Swiss-Prot record:
Provenance organism: Tolumonas auensis (strain DSM 9187 / NBRC 110442 / TA 4)
E.C. code: 3.6.1.41
Protein family membership: Belongs to the Ap4A hydrolase family.
CDD domains associated with the record: MPP_ApaH
Role played: Hydrolyzes diadenosine 5',5'''-P1,P4-tetraphosphate to yield ADP.
Pfam families in alphabetical order: Metallophos
Lineage top rank: taxon: Bacteria
Keyword Transcription regulation among UniProt keywords: no
Keyword Hydrolase (UniProt): yes
Gene from which the chain derives: apaH
Record's keyword terms, sorted: Hydrolase
GO molecular function, one term: bis(5'-nucleosyl)-tetraphosphatase (symmetrical) activity
The protein, known as: Bis(5'-nucleosyl)-tetraphosphatase, symmetrical
């Protein structure tokens, strides 16, 4: 059995299937971990959802910002954007089944036997691992509760940008969601900044990538994340793996096999523009 991790797919199902074939992924025996943003901007988001859902316990995915937005649209709290190309999900006969499944996915996942964990955007520099775990479980439970629709309708916004353990209610939950699904850069004080989406080489002087600010404990598991296509898979820290390489932007879809550290990439020239 092998364990694979794949970056943001964003509806690029044909490319996903080609990449899995290239790596000789076997759904009968292997595990597939996905960094979130299964949907939006690519042409076959419905096919991606059906494929991952059909893998059952052979697949583990985390929620990304585009996945959460789709859930908000499904719940009637947001309008579908034409550029997201998710209209056929909303009219599919298995819409309810797929959306119910998607809503139950975690925003932070840890492998039960391997020293590796996964989120969509990373881990806040203002959290230790115990805090991150607690915050993830808190929001996951809320999304699955009777308050889930309300949260999906009110999660949008960039404040607060600074963590405080005394935060309660919507400000607390918004910070948690933003940290797990939207974060890229931080200011000098560790607060989150959401405007800049460039590569670190093009950032303003007062910003730093979250992974350069966060002080991880020596015994923390490896961390896999996606979301930040401008990184093109480049992260200087050996225990952090960046896997979003901008498939939907016309760049690449990238797959990493944990067992032997093998990397597999597929060029995706069919897409000239894509998602966040």
């Amino acid at each position: 059995m092998a364990t694979y991790f794949v970056g943001d797919i964003q509806g690029c199902n044909d490319e996903l299937q080609q990449l899995l074939a290239l790596a000789q992924f076997n759904p009968q025996h292997d595990e597939l971990w996905l960094t979130g943003d299964l949907v939006a901007r690519g042409p076959k988001s419905l096919d991606v959802l059906r494929f991952v859902y059909g893998l059952g316990d052979r697949a583990t995915t985390v929620l990304g910002n585009h996945d959460l937005n789709l859930l908000a649209v499904d719940a009637g709290y947001s309008q579908a954007k034409k550029k997201d190309k998710t209209e056929n999900i909303l009219t599919a006969p298995d819409r309810h089944e797929l959306m119910t499944w998607l809503r139950t996915q975690p925003i932070m996942a840890e492998h039960p036997t391997l020293p590796v964990m996964m989120t969509h955007a990373g881990l806040s520099p203002q959290w230790d691992l115990a805090t991150a775990r607690h915050c993830a479980r808190e929001v996951e439970m809320l999304l699955r509760s009777d308050q889930g629709n309300w949260l999906l309708g009110h999660m949008y916004g960039e404040e607060p940008s600074h963590w405080d353990a005394r935060l309660t209610g919507l400000p607390r939950w918004r910070y948690i969601i933003n940290s797990f699904t939207r974060m890229r850069f931080c200011r000098n004080d560790g607060s989150l900044e959401f405007k800049c989406k460039e590569a670190p080489s093009d950032k303003p002087a007062l910003l730093a990538p979250w992974f350069e600010v966060r002080q991880a404990a020596p015994d923390e598991p490896h961390l896999v994340f996606g979301h930040w296509a401008a990184l093109m898979g480049k992260c200087p820290l050996p225990t952090i793996k960046a896997l979003d390489t901008g498939c939907v932007w016309g760049n690449q879809l990238t797959l990493w096999r944990w067992d032997d550290n093998a990397m597999f990439s597929l060029n995706c020239p069919a897409y000239a523009s894509g998602g966040e």
